[in-house]
Amino acid sequence: MATVYVNDGLSPTAATPQNRVESYDLGGKVRFATMKYTAPATGMPQIGDVLVWVPALPKGARVIPHLTKLYFATGTASSTLTVGDGASAARYLAATAITTAGSAVCEAAAASGGAYITGPASGDQMITSTVAGAGIKASQVITLHLAYVHD
């Protein structure tokens, strides 16, 4: 009988580094970054504006989609927000309505059986959100809980 590894051919005992299990697959330390944004009373972000979530992820970090979540208070009708990075503005969360209080799991990268863990950040990776549909409501609170592995 054949032995088939179900992680893209990676083996926990492989002799070459390219085929060894990575920390995000087994035994890695999950880290969390919680970032909160409160829109100002005037001069709120408008359609096309980009929110940059600070701090940046360290080089080589990988976001864990199903543990990363965006929370938001009630906002402007038609307002949407994405969560992405330099690779794609909606890498983690496609445009999502932030019109009523709620939350969204940032797992766009894992949709349709895609990559469970996204590729590593090539540099200090800035996580961004792009505003669409309508501007963000004055005093609206938006919080990003970002889970990542960096080992």
Question: Which ranges hold each PLM region?
Answer:
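Surface-exposed, low-hydrophobicity beta-strand/loop segments enriched in small/polar/acidic residues
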Residues: 2-151
